């Protein structure tokens, strides 16, 4: 890392103007959360592998900002002169730069890797000190990255109508109606999952996310896809052409946004008094925005974000079917894991009741590690229809590793499975037409007699919050941050909390994290709508000891309430994740009778729904694991 920092500082000194600081964001040209290997610039310069963060390099300091999910991981991965800056605890990066860099400082950033909103926020902070945000003409990190991975050329595929549920023509019609309503002649679409959803295409350019590196421009009478043409077959070009979409070179988007502004993009837009260009300030790059007349730009959330988040009936049906198949895979995995732990440690059950020994039963057994069991889970999933890979790196974590919220085990350094430690597994998969995030709703595996009092006390509180959120009934127009308290309140009563959000949407064979809806302590003024998805995943983490996280995926439905105060309409959640909670890990005396009734009802549905997908041994195990609980 020292050599990389030295090389970057040399480029900063020779830059015109000389740079006092260089910002290296995590994002790519599309403001993606997950990026391809060649776009992991922040990871390259800092060594921090988490998905979220921002690096700042000055002439004598190197700082890394990240959120609460990654505090522990960043502490372990940052070396040398790198210093961790904790978001929401330490000064924000723009505040730090304004207060710690000299007046008139020049602060460099690749404008393609920063959004309009972020860049403008920084500029406002810098103006107080006459500091300047400098858009570098090339990415300085790329200049020092000697073995940077090559660009991807994976083929683009079509998401057929029987899976998409809505045609490109239909989606373009609805989008153009929104353009007309906002008096906009066109819209620039930069978010990868929005481009993929709008044009019913998919790809493999980004690990775990079936998207294509591409931009889109849609006007009142034309639509364009900007992509590396090497990825697009004649069949895909024909499909897009029939849908009214023209394929252009990826780099042509820069010049075409200028033509769009002057209405010289061929064919010209049917203006009818509309001269605004719509750009999402949170996803459109500052580079593209800088090419436009700012007075003629409509800075507003992309209408595709909400359209994509509200699933159509075909998408919802696929989502539910995917979770049933995944529930069967999880049960098969736990049955296998139970058997392995019995053979190795002599326990009568890893998930069910039984006493484990501290020593292996016999030495010749194949070693079980966080990675080998994770690979086995993937193999069970891979046996299911339409499997297309994982939707994010599996978090397979034993003991203290489970306290690292987004822990990713590596074969060389991972821990061995241990019957006397908590095991947490957070995983998800892509199925051709669906995506799901599925966690064994109770991931801890250990004998209750060996548990610390902290774990014994906190597991039911996490479950209480999980149940409370999943059972919520709320008026139409409610935003996610209003519901977030339901999941946290049981922990708050003990003076405890968790640093991540409680819930996010999931895509339809797209990204595992999908907005604009969010259930989080961070306010986001986006109402929750019927047919949206949301995860329900409270947790608790004790550094150096264990981690707890319970998660189901929910679908928002209309609630059949007795009354309808204010004629608002009321909504509730439908659970679509099916896998058993680990009863032996729960202090049932801490649950109310109503919570135990809910748990038993959920387990009854698990048995009924998953039974057709399990063999005799697996079904017998499931029946045992879901026997009615009582305090």
Annotate each predicted stretch with a short phrase.
Residues 1-631:
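Active-site neighborhoods and metal-handling regions in enzymes and metal-associated proteins
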């Amino acid at each position: 890392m020292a050599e990389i920092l030295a090389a970057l500082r040399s480029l900063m000194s020779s830059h015109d103007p000389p740079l006092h600081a260089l910002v290296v964001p995590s994002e790519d040209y599309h403001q993606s959360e997950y990026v391809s290997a060649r776009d992991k610039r922040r990871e390259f310069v800092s060594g921090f592998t988490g998905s979220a963060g921002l690096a700042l390099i000055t002439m004598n300091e190197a700082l890394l900002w990240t959120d609460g999910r990654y505090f522990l991981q960043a502490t372990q991965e940052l070396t040398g002169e790198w210093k961790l800056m904790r978001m929401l605890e330490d000064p924000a990066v723009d505040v730090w730069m304004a207060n710690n860099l000299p007046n008139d400082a020049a602060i460099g950033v690749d404008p393609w890797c920063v959004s309009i909103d972020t860049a403008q926020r920084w500029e406002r902070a810098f103006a107080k000190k006459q500091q300047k945000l400098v858009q570098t003409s090339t990415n300085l990190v790329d200049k020092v990255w000697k073995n940077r991975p090559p660009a991807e050329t994976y083929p683009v595929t079509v998401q057929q109508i029987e899976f998409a549920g809505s045609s490109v023509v239909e989606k373009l019609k609805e989008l153009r109606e929104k353009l007309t309503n906002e008096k906009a002649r066109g819209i620039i679409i930069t978010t990868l999952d929005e481009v993929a959803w709008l044009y019913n295409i998919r790809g493999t350019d980004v690990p775990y996310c079936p998207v294509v590196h591409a931009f889109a421009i849609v006007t009142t009478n034309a639509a364009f896809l900007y992509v590396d043409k090497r990825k697009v077959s004649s069949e895909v070009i024909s499909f897009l052409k029939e849908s009214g979409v023209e394929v252009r070179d990826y780099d042509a988007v820069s010049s075409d946004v200028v033509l769009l502004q002057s209405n010289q993009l061929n064919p010209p837009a049917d203006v009818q008094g509309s001269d605004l260009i719509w750009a999402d300030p949170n996803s459109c790059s500052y580079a593209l925005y800088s090419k436009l007349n700012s007075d003629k730009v409509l800075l507003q959330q992309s209408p595709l974000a909400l359209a994509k988040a509200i699933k159509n009936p075909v998408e919802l049906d696929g989502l539910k079917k995917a979770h049933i198949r995944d529930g069967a895979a999880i049960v098969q995995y736990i049955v296998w894991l139970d058997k392995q732990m019995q053979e190795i440690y002599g326990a009568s059950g890893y998930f069910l009741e039984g006493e484990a020994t501290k020593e292996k039963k016999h030495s010749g057994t194949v070693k079980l590690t966080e990675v080998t069991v994770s690979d086995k889970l993937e193999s069970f999933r891979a046996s299911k229809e339409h499997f297309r890979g994982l939707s994010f790196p599996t978090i397979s974590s034993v003991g203290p590793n489970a306290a690292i919220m987004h822990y990713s085990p590596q074969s060389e350094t991972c821990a061995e499975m241990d019957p006397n430690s908590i095991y947490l597994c957070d995983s998800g998969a892509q199925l051709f037409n669906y995506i799901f995030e599925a966690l064994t709703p109770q991931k801890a595996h250990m004998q209750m007699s060996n548990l610390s009092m902290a774990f014994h006390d906190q597991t039911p509180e996490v479950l209480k919050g999980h149940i409370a959120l999943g059972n919520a009934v709320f008026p139409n127009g409610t935003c996610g941050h209003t519901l977030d308290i339901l999941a946290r309140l049981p922990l708050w009563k003990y003076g405890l909390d968790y640093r991540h959000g409680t819930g996010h949407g999931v895509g339809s064979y797209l990204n595992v994290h999908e907005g604009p809806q969010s259930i989080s302590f961070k306010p986001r003024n986006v109402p929750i709508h019927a047919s949206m998805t949301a995860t329900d995943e409270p947790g608790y983490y004790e550094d150096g000891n264990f981690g707890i996280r319970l998660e189901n995926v929910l679908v928002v439905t209309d609630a059949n309430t007795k009354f309808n105060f204010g004629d608002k309409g009321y909504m509730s959640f439908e659970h679509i994740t099916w896998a058993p909670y680990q009863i032996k890990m729960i202090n049932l005396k801490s649950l109310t009778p109503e919570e135990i009734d809910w748990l038993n009802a959920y387990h009854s549905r698990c048995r009924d729904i998953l039974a057709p997908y399990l063999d005799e041994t697996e079904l017998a195990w499931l029946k045992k694991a879901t026997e009615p609980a009582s305090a």
